[in-house]
A protein has these predicted regions:
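Conserved alpha/beta-hydrolase "nucleophile elbow" surrounding the catalytic nucleophile
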Residues: 25-27, 85, 89-91, 194
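Catalytic histidine-centered segment of alpha/beta-hydrolase-like enzymes
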Residues: 222-235
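Flexible "cap/lid" loop of the alpha/beta hydrolase fold
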Residues: 95-138
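Conserved alpha/beta-hydrolase "acid-adjacent" motif
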Residues: 198-204
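Active-site loop/oxyanion-hole signature of alpha/beta-hydrolase fold enzymes
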Residues: 46-88, 236
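Conserved alpha/beta-hydrolase catalytic His-Asp/Glu region
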Residues: 125-184
């Protein structure tokens, strides 16, 4: 579904008697993130995802602000008045989900961080690639983030000329919050990690979980791209949580 500016994926088939999960894509990615996610048709709506500005089929420009993306999604969701909605963010998308809940009082049933943690700090080498173009940055992330060999992984990232990846990676680097504030959020938080993910800082995970009440799940033999590397197991875990 589209309006003049924004692409809404699977919103045309929403049944308000079923559970809904809004998925939020990581840096440079879009609605193709959920193409292999399978949830029970009798219990869940199809995976919902909104392309961020400048991503996928949404118009506009990308941003170097997590807060901007959070505000964008909240405004985009307003006409739908969704109830029983959970948030599931991949990588950068996890930070956006945290911001929606913490700084904008968004009411979510569950919050799931997939291959994501706060803080997310980006290597200088990756930022240097992103300053040149989206392709080099995507190749870098795939090289260090992908564990299972997958053909066509590059196609999941932005192919635009605009420096979308640089904006998104800067947004991750720039984002600041207080873990003690998250601790007081009355929404269940789950973290899903890949055992072979080299892009998530395990010390940051340890610090986060020491302060914030949360449940951690680890997927075996999976890197940073669990949505593509093992969508069956990821779908099972999400169904278990929500």
């Amino acid at each position: 579904m589209k309006n003049s500016e924004t692409y809404f994926h699977n919103f045309e088939s929403i049944d308000n008697t079923k559970k809904s999960i809004l998925f939020i894509a990581g840096a440079g990615m879009d609605h193709r993130l959920v193409r292999a996610i399978r949830l029970s048709d009798s219990e869940y709506n199809k995976p919902l995802i909104i392309d961020l500005p400048g991503h996928g089929e949404s118009k506009g420009s990308s941003s170097n602000s997590i807060e901007y993306y959070g505000q964008f999604l909240i405004k985009a969701l307003e006409p739908y008045e969704l109830k029983d909605l959970s948030l599931c963010g991949h990588s950068m998308g996890g930070l956006i989900a945290l911001d929606m809940v913490l700084n904008h009082n968004f009411e979510a049933k569950e919050l799931i961080l997939v291959n994501s943690i706060y803080p997310t700090r980006v290597a200088d080498a990756l930022l240097a690639k992103a300053k040149v173009g989206n392709g080099g940055a995507a190749n870098f992330i795939i090289k260090y983030g992908l564990y299972r060999r997958l053909l066509g992984m590059r196609n999941a990232f932005s192919e635009a000329d605009d420096l979308v990846m640089l904006d998104d990676l800067d947004a991750c680097n720039n984002y600041e919050l207080d873990l003690n504030d998250i601790k007081n959020v009355e929404i269940p938080i789950s973290i899903i990690l890949g055992s072979k993910d080299r892009l998530v800082d395990l010390k940051a995970v340890e610090n986060f979980t020491d302060i914030v009440p949360s449940q951690t799940y680890t997927m075996d033999e999976v890197g940073h791209f669990s949505f593509f590397e093992d969508p069956v197991e990821l779908s099972r875990l999400i169904s278990k949580i929500v």
